Amino acid sequence: MEARVCVLFGAAALLRLLLLCVGVYQDQTLKLKYTDVDYHVFTDAARFITQGESPYRRSTFRYTPLLALLLVPNVYLSLLFGKLLFGFCDLLSGLLMFRLLVLRGASHGSACVSCGLWLLNPLPMAVSTRGNAESVLAVLVLSTLLCLQLRKHTTAALLFGLSVHMKIYPVTYALPIALALTAAPARGRGVLLRFFSPALLRFAAVSAAVFLSLGLIFYCRYGWEFLQEAYLYHLTRRDLRHNFSPFFYLQYVCAERCWSSGLLPLLLLPQLLLLLLASAAFSSDLPFCCFLHTAVFVSFNRVCTSQYFLWYLCLLPVVLPRLRLRLGRGLLLLLLWLLLQGLWLAPAYLLEFQGWNSFSWIWAASLLFLLTNTFILAQIIQHYRPHDRKAD
């Protein structure tokens, strides 16, 4: 590995270790804690598992028990174990990005620059060192794409099934993956026959077997509570508190109406339509299509928080070298994205900490943020160079 790659990863590791030390100091001395409250939820759930009880005895633990099992060393070794694990997954994500970029024809220099936007990005650094598990899913998603790029379809299917078990949103990649797997060998066949290709059937069988097996194991152990907290809660969740999605206000004002439950299918329609269009248009370039899928899913979701941004930011470095955006335009789009977040945070702060009734201002800022995200995605699509198979 080149010296500059080693320097990049070494600097990224040191920065994360530094943030861990800062977090320990802040937690011990300041009123405002560094550690994410979810990290304490994960640890408590792991402690219940070590006692032979259900992790769902910990209120607000709404994840797979597999996550609690990963953090059992928090109980026996050190509370820092999980943060070290998540930080390591951050670095591993960067390595997977580098491999993907090189496979897609990027030079080592270009790959280093793109990976640096993840490895030296303060957002993923802060999220992982505060104890949020998003980096684990980033590793699974990037590993799936890398194995598909290497045409290791069985391994990719195993990882994809595990990804969907960990969190629901990667299931949106199913259609792009299906189209990508059937594109080359199924030319000349009917549209429906393409979906019966051996490669796709094998991928579907393996990924479904992984997902269903893990689900069955945990259902037998923890019963309906597992299905409710790990999956059904997220499918039916209505966040009436303020978040980046403009749909939160609609759910807030209609919460007490008898017909409010009928809003859910309507809120899903924009997402579904855009995901179908993205699949049809860009499935030949799977990493780019998955990036668009995730960005659309997050932007148009009925609940959107800042940690969701990592779901597509971990894919952005992989597609970045094929963007033909001028540096000035790219920086302007980044500034616009950050500015609109600040515009949203101002009334959210007034509501949360000052008690002001600023719901309408938050809603207006959420609408502007959605429009901004849509504009940025349109710019990315417009300036993206189509996938060149020879580069692989």
Swiss-Prot record:
Provide the membrane topology annotation: Multi-pass membrane protein
Alphabetical keyword list: Endoplasmic reticulum, Glycosyltransferase, GPI-anchor biosynthesis, Membrane, Transferase, Transmembrane, Transmembrane helix
Q: Determine the domain of life of the protein's source.
A: Eukaryota
Which molecular function terms from Gene Ontology are attached? glycolipid 1,4-alpha-mannosyltransferase activity; mannosyltransferase activity
User: What EC number(s) is this enzyme filed under?
Assistant: 2.4.1.-
List the ranges whose topology is Lumenal.
Answer: 26-65, 149-156, 220-261, 324-330, 382-392
Q: In which pathway does it act?
A: Glycolipid biosynthesis; glycosylphosphatidylinositol-anchor biosynthesis
- Record-level GO cellular component terms: endoplasmic reticulum membrane; glycosylphosphatidylinositol-mannosyltransferase I complex
Q: Which GO terms describe its biological process?
A: GPI anchor biosynthetic process
- Residue ranges, Cytoplasmic compartment? 1-4, 87-125, 178-198, 283-302, 352-360
- Disulfide-bonded cysteine pairs: these are none
Q: Check the record and name the InterPro entries matching this protein.
A: PIG-M (IPR007704)
Pfam name, any one: Mannosyl_trans
**What compartments host this protein?**
Endoplasmic reticulum membrane
TM helices/strands, residue ranges: 5-25, 66-86, 126-148, 157-177, 199-219, 262-282, 303-323, 331-351, 361-381
What does this gene product do?
Catalytic subunit of the glycosylphosphatidylinositol-mannosyltransferase I complex which catalyzes the transfer of the first mannose, via an alpha-1,4 bond from a dolichol-phosphate-mannose (Dol-P-Man) to the glucosaminyl acyl phosphatidylinositol (GlcN-(acyl)PI) intermediate to generate alpha-D-Man-(1->4)-alpha-D-GlcN-(1->6)-(1-radyl,2-acyl-sn-glycero-3-phospho)-2-acyl-inositol and participates in the sixth step of the glycosylphosphatidylinositol-anchor biosynthesis.
Name the family the entry cites.
Belongs to the PIGM family.
> How does it associate, per the subunit comment?
Part of the glycosylphosphatidylinositol-mannosyltransferase I complex that is composed of PIGM and PIGX.
Protein name (database record): GPI alpha-1,4-mannosyltransferase I, catalytic subunit
Q: Which organism is it from?
A: Danio rerio (Zebrafish)
Gene this protein is translated from: pigm
